[in-house]
């Protein structure tokens, strides 16, 4: 099991533990009003040389605590967008898929999980990743090697195939499809039905951690194994990974190139946090807001789902009303100036197109475009004030005691609780070190100076 443990350790260290970020994207986006007409590329995006993608596609990421209603709201948003004429894909990145259930697809349930978009109506498809099929499409060499290692331990082929699903495979597969659809101009809007908060953080951090792995670990692993393989294969109980294994990793990385720029571009990607008017869920939503901000994503809406309608009044429900009213006021205060929307609790379960369209009418105003770009404020910026270089990060809900700072190479590392974010510094600041930090009005300002 030693080689397999080493392999799992490499994957874990590269994909999970690094938490690193590349240097900021060498491109910028000029603010635009809404989206260009479907199928017509925008002309106001300036990109780094050699990186080409469809600049007019929007990504709406619905995230929140498990069970708050993300899938229903994402599905309703997809229906509204399709009715407005957008080529829309609602894509589940939650391992526990429920998109098919949301649209009440009984006969088609098992057809949906084919790793191909499933049409719902003109302009709308849904997509539930089937990880077994994704392994055959994208991870064949990696999976085959892991299975061969596991077989040497005496476990059955079926068990080996199950255990060969390594952490991060599903998230990276979803990222590859997002990148592919963007480059091929397949859709105008992709609505992502995300996993609960912790898994969502793993999803958005995957491209940057993979980038770190490819720069710092991959070349060393490949060259070392290439040198020792002829001797090691004579004495080791199993063969070491071949060149095709590393070629598979390189191919995956190339398919993901540029996806981090897509995810962190506020004119492309917006996060919509879904919550319920309950104190425990509110705390989770606050943490999610901080984590998304720390990763460079823009939250443009907070949606409070399942609010008790005012007409439901009796002695038993009064306490619930008082509690929800209190939490709702806190929500509006905490998240200002981010808009907070309130969606009432429906009389029965929201299932099927008709009920989802009713939900969409409550969620969005009649003339409202859910794909419109409404907030583009970046969570962190670089600047210069009174001759002093600064890094400014918007960190709502964080306190001074929560935050840790240190410099590593040409990166500024910010820690909040168990989360770590590596912020690549521009060349003009790469040699500087943090000298002082202050947290005022939800804004962390880190002053940088030359080392002594």
PLM regions: where:
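Short, positively charged and aromatic/hydrophobic N-terminal segments
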Residues: 43, 50-53
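Beta-rich strand-turn-strand
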Residues: 401, 430-450
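Nucleotide-state-sensitive switch-loop elements of NTP-binding domains
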Residues: 56-68, 72-257
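Cationic, low-complexity basic patches in intrinsically disordered or flexible, solvent-exposed regions
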Residues: 27, 33, 41
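Generic beta-strand structural signal
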Residues: 384, 407-408, 439
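C-terminal lobe/tail of nucleotide-utilizing enzymes
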Residues: 50, 253-400, 413, 418-420, ...
């Amino acid at each position: 099991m030693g080689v397999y443990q080493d392999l799992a350790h490499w994957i874990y260290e590269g994909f999970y533990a690094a938490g690193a970020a590349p240097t900021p994207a060498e491109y910028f986006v000029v603010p635009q009003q809404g989206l260009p007409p479907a199928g017509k590329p925008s002309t106001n995006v300036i990109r780094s040389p050699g990186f080409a993608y469809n600049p007019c596609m929007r990504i709406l990421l619905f995230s929140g605590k498990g069970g708050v209603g993300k899938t229903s709201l994402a599905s309703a948003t997809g229906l509204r967008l399709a009715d407005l004429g957008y080529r829309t894909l609602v894509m589940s990145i939650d391992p526990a898929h429920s998109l098919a259930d949301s649209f009440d697809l009984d006969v088609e349930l098992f057809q949906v999980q084919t790793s191909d978009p499933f049409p719902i109506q003109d302009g709308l498809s849904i997509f539930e990743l089937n990880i077994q099929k994704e392994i055959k499409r994208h991870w064949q060499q990696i999976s085959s090697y892991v299975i061969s290692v596991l077989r040497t331990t005496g476990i059955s082929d079926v068990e080996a195939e199950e255990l060969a699903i390594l952490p991060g495979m599903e998230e990276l597969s979803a990222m590859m499809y997002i990148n592919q659809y963007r480059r091929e101009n397949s859709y105008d809007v992709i609505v992502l039905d995300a996993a609960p908060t912790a898994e969502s953080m793993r999803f958005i951090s995957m491209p940057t951690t993979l980038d770190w792995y490819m720069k710092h670990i991959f070349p060393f692993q490949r060259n070392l194994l290439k040198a020792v393989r002829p001797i090691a294969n004579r004495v080791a109980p199993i063969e070491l990974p071949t060149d095709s294994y590393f070629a598979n990793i390189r191919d995956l990385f190339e398919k993901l190139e540029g996806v981090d720029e897509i995810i962190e571009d506020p004119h492309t990607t917006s996060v919509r946090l879904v919550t319920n008017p309950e104190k425990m869920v509110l705390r989770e939503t606050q943490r999610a807001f901080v984590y998304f901000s720390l990763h460079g994503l823009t939250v443009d809406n907070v949606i409070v789902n399942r609010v008790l309608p005012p007409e439901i009044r009796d002695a038993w429900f009064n306490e619930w009303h008082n509690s929800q009213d209190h939490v709702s006021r806190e929500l509006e205060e905490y998240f200002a100036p981010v808009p907070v929307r309130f969606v009432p609790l429906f009389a029965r379960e929201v299932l099927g197109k008709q009920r989802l369209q009713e939900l969409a009418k409550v969620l969005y105003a009649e003339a409202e475009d859910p794909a419109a770009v409404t907030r583009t404020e970046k969570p962190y910026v670089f600047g210069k004030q009174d001759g002093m270089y600064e890094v400014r990060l918007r960190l709502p809900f964080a306190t001074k005691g929560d935050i840790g700072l240190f410099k590593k190479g040409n990166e500024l590392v910010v820690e909040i609780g168990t989360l770590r974010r590596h912020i690549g510094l521009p060349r003009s600041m790469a040699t500087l070190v943090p000298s002082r930090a202050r947290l005022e009005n939800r804004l962390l300002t880190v002053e940088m100076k030359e080392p002594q």
